[in-house]
Design a protein with these regions (language model features):
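C-terminal structural cap/anchor segments
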Residues: 51-113
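Hydrophobic, glycine-enriched assembly/anchoring segments
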Residues: 134-171
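Acidic, serine/threonine- and glycine-rich low-complexity intrinsically disordered segments
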Residues: 1-71, 75-77
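Short, solvent-exposed coil/turn segments at beta-strand boundaries
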Residues: 2-6, 31-34, 65-70, 118-130, ...
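Beta-propeller fold detector
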Residues: 37-52, 101-110, 152-159
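Repeated scaffold domains used in trafficking and secretory/extracellular systems
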Residues: 1, 51-66, 112-122, 158-171
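Beta-propeller blade signature
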Residues: 22-35, 87-99, 144-147
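Short, solvent-exposed loop/turn segments at conserved positions within beta-propeller repeat blades
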Residues: 15-25, 82-89, 135-139
């Protein structure tokens, strides 16, 4: 939910019942008269974004809200259905739901240098960042991605493995 609008991020993929139907990752919106008594009743007919068109045909794995209408997208590493077949999701980008602009994230290690990305993450909408733990070929490192699409390496963790990062805030 961004303001009075609800955005739906759909992973898309392949219809596994058939070999022919391919559904793109997409963003849909619910707003205005399509929200009645605080409940969504319909999807806006004037808002549809084919994320595969924006991301070089990469499918969506997960998304994280960064504030200021921007989401960090975690995408399958390889484009097209090869991404599903191969299965890793080591590509990131920033998507602005208002402008519908997509910006690839810079500053991340090459996909071949990333062994794993932890599922747990730390999101800070006040600062517009999301932090992930990456197990790279040189060890565990926390990477922070900002809403401008820049990833910055942070703390290197001296451990065999780390399963994620969290953010605690005092209210």
């Amino acid at each position: 939910v961004v303001g009075d609008k609800i955005y739906l991020f759909c992973q898309g993929g392949k219809n596994f019942q058939t070999n022919s139907l391919r559904v793109p990752s997409a963003v849909l919106r619910i707003s205005g008269s399509n929200i009645q008594s605080g409940k969504p009743v319909d999807i806006d007919s004037d808002y549809y974004v084919d994320l595969n068109d924006k991301t070089g045909d990469r499918y969506l794995w997960r998304c994280y809200y960064l504030g200021d209408n921007k989401f960090c997208l975690q995408l399958f590493t390889n484009p097209g259905m090869d991404g599903y077949t191969e299965g890793t999701h080591k590509t990131f980008g920033i998507f602005d739901v208002e402008t519908q602009n997509y910006t690839p994230v810079t500053g991340m290690p090459e996909a071949g240098d990333i062994n794993d990305i932890a599922l747990a993450y730390a999101s800070d909408t006040d600062k517009g960042t999301v932090t992930f733990e990456l197990m790279t070929t040189s060890g565990a490192v926390l990477y922070t991605i900002n809403r401008n699409g820049v990833a910055t390496p942070g703390t290197k963790v001296e451990a065999e493995v780390i399963k994620g990062a969290s953010l605690l805030k005092q209210k």
